[in-house]
Amino acid sequence: MAPGLWGPSPPVVLLLLSLLGLAAAGKLLVTSVDGSPWFSIREGLDMLRQKGHEVVVVVPEVSLNIKTSENFVIKRYPVPFTQEDMDNAVKTLFRIIFEGGSFLERYFKGMENMKIVSDFIVSSCEQLLQNKELIRYLEESKFDAILTDPVIPCGVILAEHLSLPSVYFLRGIPCGLDFEASQCPNPPSYVPRSFSDLTDQMTFFQRVKNLLFDTQNLFLCDFAFEPYSKLASEFLQREVTVQDLLRNGSVWLLRMEFVLDYPRPLMPNMIPIGGANCAHKELPQEFEAVVNASGEHGIVVFSLGSMVSEIPMKKAMEIAEALGTVPQTVFWRYTGKAPPNLPKNVKLVKWLPQNDLLAHPKTRAFITHGGSHGVYEGICNAVPMVLMPLFGDQMDNAKRVESRGAGLTLNILEMTSSDISNALKAVINDKKYKENIQRLSDLHLDRPIHPLDLAVHWVEFVMRHKGAPHLRPAAHDLNWVQYHSLDVIAFLAAVTLLSLFISFKCCLCCCRRFCCKKGRTGKATKAKSH
């Protein structure tokens, strides 16, 4: 009997299956994701593209790390500043970090330069919202969802305008606005605030300090997000704040995981995906050859992140001197001028496959600035760390690694060559650091689904179901008084006081009656006796 009588041939089945996959594919808009977060999410976007989804990335002509890609569509829009302007501002910011002088002097210089960078970012957002041609394209493209980093809330404003369900991809908002907007409990008694340099085990005065940071964070949020609230109100043509818009997020993909971060409450739509960037590939041949030639001593990986292009020569020479005191071969990612005392065991490279090197069994230590991207790579690959935090959440990340016994933290301004050498030798030679980071790595990897797959799943989930309203807590519909049950407490207190008052009055009345009756009885008895 002819095969065609029983059903379609295999090629036809494959064609039908491929068409079914295309029918299920969605369209994702990505915006306001640059810098280190871009490196963390890029692999997830590649995976979404491989699954048949169309990915459109909206990015300004001037960006930090986003380049062209074959896997997704890049839509660029003009901005009123150049790449050189942005690069110079970032370089100046990091130069100030390394400069000497008093704390206040460095603080005000840093704030002044940070404002320049911030103005560039706000201006970029304004140009996007005012680009009528691009906005029209986005309106007509019928996206299923938007993926954005809410730290730069331009994507959040776009999501509201386009009526799109949003997936937030972030490490955290420094002033705690993420937890406030999501109605997530954030008790200061055991949840350390950003930049507080505290752990979850706090003394009384540390808890006082932690609570005071909440007051500081209120001003920080107002200062940082007021320009975006103004932009949003003008663009959406109604009075609105960034916090109002953030409340509409469908899913929060948090670049955190409780192996590193301290246990704390999360809402049902908050998904920890720390370590999503840990998949590694084979080393390029030129790196593999150097690693194999390192012998029994192995290698050390050193990188202060993609944004630090150079450091002052004096500091670079101190670092070079320290690196020469260990027998390991050191890969140092550095694009500045090579220090004249660079030892033979140090290989300066403009780029290195960081995660692939950390995954190599010959890697003995990782010197890092403490960015969450690199820290999770260190944990995934069980490499003890020497941390030199520069700014932002890096101080908090370093504190967490050190409190777990998986590394040592150095003050990059005050550290000497001897400090660097001693810290590096300690994490290499003292077995406790390797044992502790190995334990963290085992805990982190012992999970039913890889963080990257989990992140991709939730993006697809939001695209398929047009959001996740079933995960939205009713707390969003309550005011402050209702949320804290102050009205209920007041009602119960009033009922209790009223009951006590009535009981008191009843007792008083009974006592008076009893006393009066007793008085009359006494008088009657006296009258009879006479």
What residue ranges belong to the model's regions?
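Donor nucleotide-sugar binding/catalytic pocket of nucleotide-sugar-dependent glycosyltransferases
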Residues: 251-255, 268-278
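Glycosyltransferase specificity loop/lid
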Residues: 2-234, 243, 260, 274-281, ...
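A generic secondary-structure signal marking the coil-to-beta-strand transition
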Residues: 248-250, 269, 298-300, 344-345
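Long, low-complexity segments enriched in small/aliphatic residues
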Residues: 245-260
